[in-house]
Amino acid sequence: MFKSMISSIVMRSMQKKINAQTISETDVQAVLKEIRIALLDADVNLLVVKNFIKAIREQTVGQTVEPGQDLQKWLLKVIKQELINILSQPNQEITSKRPLKVMVVGLQGSGKTTTCGKLAVWLKKQFQQKAMLVALDIYRPAAIDQLATLAEQTESVFFAKGTQAPDQTTKEAVKTFKESGCQAIICDTAGRLQTNQELMDELVAIKNELHPDEILMVVDGLSGQEIINVAKEFHNRLKLTGFIITKLDSDARAGAALSLTSLLEVPIKLMGTSEKLTGLEQFHPERIASRILGLGDVMTLVEKAEEVFDKQSLTKTVSKMFLGKMDLEDLLLYMEQMNQMGSVSSIVKMLPGNLTVSDDHVESIEAKVKLWKVLINSMTREERRHPKLINRDPSRKQRIIKGSGRKMDELNKLMKEWSKLQTKTAEMGRMLKGGKNPFSGFGGLGGLGF
């Protein structure tokens, strides 16, 4: 769905000058038709699409146009607000009630168990609260082992009772939870199909023992239209409080998954953005609307950077860059910190449309970063801090090649590009001092040699 780039449709369809003071049905007909096709291609539910197009038509047809008004920007603003309306529901955030009791449900293979681990990490990061993970999937022994591993990785308390009836295990877990000192209990239920009434009854029994504050359904972003009927059944039996949509970092169309919130009037509370345990984020309708329109998501990008980059060390690194004194150890630290923000592709998706990078270029950047890290990690600290030592001594190059398992021309290319980077960043520093734009005339991502 993020690939639909509705903004390009608007720009392409609104090229002709509208001379009349009032916008007519004919003026917006072409753009609405293309938007409808784009949304359906993204697997958005037909009813949601119809309501969306109707709302846009009602807000545009008959509206008075001010002389000189930018119609593209005006129409994009209307479209963005309607997207926000579709994606928004009351109680969008995880409840602030503590202690917090969460029941996680969903279809088989939707990623519930992994999401439970991610949720524990998210709660710890956002609220400094420790969680208890409860294994209730007695039909898949590997699920219990997986949750135990996740509990260890996330420093959470783990609770399981083997193949004991899940509702009885829940009852015992709640008692232990009250005495554990944990602020949240997260129950991982067995994956099931909506047609299996016996297992659905089991969920109801678990709910009656847990009395959860949140009942969250995990939905795969790759799901098709069938997920809507599935979610309706879960909601009818359990009264869901929210959805967690996974794989929104991929090229998944995600239209069906995102349609759920409008059709069921249940908020999307969290979204999966990577396979890492840290890859769970709060769902912000306005930010997702911006991504869908190709306007980027700068706020999330800034938040990620603030989490990863230490202000003092970043200031030091940037100062060295603009003085032309950035060494390979600085470059390695920079690449590792960028990696903590997410993959190159996930970062690129947050950039506004006019700053986007092609998929081929993204793959090229990711491959180059991986190669550079291998080569730099094969150097001594002295070599990283004084890269010119490598160029002066062929034996150092031979040792680095042998240790990294890479080719000599790859190392030579790294050294050449590092030298270019030194020159570029020093020039950028001089431009800054002169009050000029340091990024004009430089290619790649920020002109950093990529």
Curated annotation (Swiss-Prot):
The keyword Hydrolase applies. It comes from the Bacteria. GO terms for molecular function: 7S RNA binding; ATP hydrolysis activity; GTP binding; GTPase activity. Gene3D superfamilies: P-loop containing nucleotide triphosphate hydrolases, Signal recognition particle SRP54, nucleotide-binding domain, Signal recognition particle, SRP54 subunit, M-domain. Its EC number is 3.6.5.4. This is Signal recognition particle protein. Composed of three domains: the N-terminal N domain, which is responsible for interactions with the ribosome, the central G domain, which binds GTP, and the C-terminal M domain, which binds the RNA and the signal sequence of the RNC. It is found in: Cytoplasm. GO terms for biological process: SRP-dependent cotranslational protein targeting to membrane. GTP binds at residues 106-113, 188-192, 246-249. SMART domains: AAA (SM00382), SRP54 (SM00962), SRP54_N (SM00963). Involved in targeting and insertion of nascent membrane proteins into the cytoplasmic membrane. Binds to the hydrophobic signal sequence of the ribosome-nascent chain (RNC) as it emerges from the ribosomes. The SRP-RNC complex is then targeted to the cytoplasmic membrane where it interacts with the SRP receptor FtsY. The lineage of its organism: Bacteria, Bacillati, Mycoplasmatota, Mycoplasmoidales, Mycoplasmoidaceae. It catalyses: GTP + H2O = GDP + phosphate + H(+). The keyword Metal-binding does not apply.
